[in-house]
Design a protein with these regions (language model features):
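A structural signal for leucine-rich repeat
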Residues: 89-92, 119-120, 160-161, 199
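Consensus positions within tandem repeat domains that build extended binding/scaffold surfaces
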Residues: 12-17, 40-43, 63-66, 95-97, ...
Length: 271
């Protein structure tokens, strides 16, 4: 492996770019050189036969196109990872994991938040397993993951049932055109904007259930607190079944143009 002279904790820029003979990388074995904390831009780009890598639990940073167009089909995201940078490829801004054949991602126990743009443009991604510890899906995490159709929490979690996620930020699932159903339980906020719709472009989405959260003060008064943001599900014409429960606010045009709201109104009273 190649390391930076100063810290010896970085797999350097383009270190193994287009090394087509590379098949497996075990970062844990590199600790004699220092804790591998950074995989730099294009470090493994074009390693089309790289099918196995162990992302060390010391890893904190993955930079642009680090694993672009590799043979990886499955990875586990360590809880130590705190930074991912996107980069431009083929005229689009994509995550370091795009351009290849990555089909399954598992987030390790202890991960509390996905990172912005983490798998953006990874069009091969089909399945994501989240830990119960994960509370926030950040902006554009799975944007344009057009093959994503299965989400679960834990090994025994129900398919497309997210019951521990509290916040979903703008664009998180925008362009996930293979996702057909989604159940959100105990969600406090679905952030969204008309220019970056959280579930925009989910053209196969047929059924959505959202159960909000309530808070109870010391007098016993219960208050609704969940908000569904502007244009969150707008123009998903296949979406014909929407179940909402204990929702405080459905923002402007949240469901406009969906199959159940062709007149342009928001189905805020649907339960």
């Amino acid at each position: 492996m190649e390391f930076s002279d100063e810290t010896k904790n970085t797999v350097c820029t383009k270190a193994f770019k287009n090394v087509t003979s590379l098949q497996s990388v075990e970062l844990a074995y590199c600790l004699a050189y220092g804790n591998i904390s950074t995989i730099d831009a294009s470090a493994f780009e074009g390693c089309v036969n790289l099918t196995d890598i162990n992302l060390s639990d010391k890893l904190t940073t993955i930079n642009g196109l680090a694993f672009y167009n590799t043979g990886l089909t499955e990875i586990t995201v360590p809880a130590s990872l705190t930074k991912i940078t996107a980069a431009s490829a083929a005229g689009k801004t994509v995550s370091p994991f795009a351009g290849g054949v990555l089909r399954k991602v598992t987030f390790a126990d202890g991960v509390t938040k996905s990172l912005q743009g983490m798998f953006m443009g990874t069009t091969s991604l089909e399945e994501v397993v989240l830990p119960e510890s994960l509370k926030t899906i950040d902006q554009n995490t799975f944007k344009d993951c057009s093959s994503l159709k299965k989400l679960s929490v834990g090994k025994s979690g129900g398919e497309n049932v997210l019951d521990t996620v509290e916040t979903i930020n703008a664009g998180a699932f925008n362009g996930c055109s293979s996702l057909e159903t989604l159940t959100l339980k105990n969600v406090a906020k679905i952030d969204s904007s008309d220019t970056n719709r959280t579930f925009g472009g989910c053209m196969s989405l047929k059924k959505v259930s959202v159960t909000g959260v309530t808070t109870t003060d010391n007098t016993g008064k219960t208050t609704l607190s969940t908000t569904i943001g502007t244009s969150a599900f707008k123009d998903n014409k296949a979406l014909k079944e929407i179940n909402l429960d204990t929702i405080k606010t459905v923002s402007q045009e949240a469901f406009r143009g969906c199959g159940v709201a062709d007149d342009g109104t928001d189905p805020a009273t649907l339960t």
